[in-house]
């Protein structure tokens, strides 16, 4: 992801946030709907070995910071989920088969539809988040601590709620 130009990365902000993009030309403007799943990858550092247990990182702190800073905070704020991938070894006993995963996703979609949602969790509006992502007092307290500790923006809090709702649906839980 950081290897794309800054202008391309910043151009992703509108479609990621608003599900639309405005193309302006000399005499006209055209609005296109942009419903898509954004999946991206980046190394933890320029050499790619920062989190490796097998190889040594060759980067200094300045290089790592410069690499990470290629993505602006507003751009990062529009990404729903970050997953850090460590070295993987085949002795993991918690592997879920593709078939099981597929079945869980279908059940989660059905659960969302039965709840009356017009959109999947990832595309819920602010109003729908309040309707479908209901937290008990303990969850509210945990979210407030996270907001303060990680300086979460309003947008980030909504993303946390949508991801939590999705995880709950996949695990067949209410919340």
Language-model features: where?
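Basic, amphipathic alpha-helical bundle interface domains used for macromolecular binding and assembly
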Residues: 6-175
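Conserved Walker B
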Residues: 1-4
